[in-house]
Amino acid sequence: LQELKTVAQSFVDNLSQFLIKNVVAFRHGSVQHIAPEVGTRTGLRSIGKYLLTEDDVLQCRKFHDAIANSSWPIEEWGQQRRVNIRYFAEQDFYQVPAGCLQSKSISNLFFAGRNISSTEGAIASARVMGICLQTGYASGCMAAAEALGLSQNDAVKQVQNGQL
């Protein structure tokens, strides 16, 4: 594991230096935090207008501003690669609301993938590829709407209808 950690740290250092040197948007950037160990699935949590909870997942909660659907169970990985899987009702699903993608305190900051606003229990389900793709698309659409001065409600409706 130590060798992997060294390789990963080197990769992060090289990539950040490349971006700072070659991409104007990163000119004054810096790396503030990386995972403390190789294989860590979660870390610092973003705080959005809504916090997706473990209860939302297990109760298959639906939202009027839903931008993603998931039927993936909560999978919590422990030591020695042991996993505890908690399932919810068969043939049901939960939804991720748009509020999980927009910062609570910065109006033009949006989240996607493993960075959505959620508890540790909720992200143990929502960090899978399908949700990452759906939230990435929706977050980009919401950010574009913000930049164009459109309402977030209209952006969410357009995402829901596949119009963006």
Q: What is the role of each PLM region?
A:
Residues 1-164:
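Flavin (FAD/FMN)-binding glycine-rich loop and adjacent Rossmann-like elements that form
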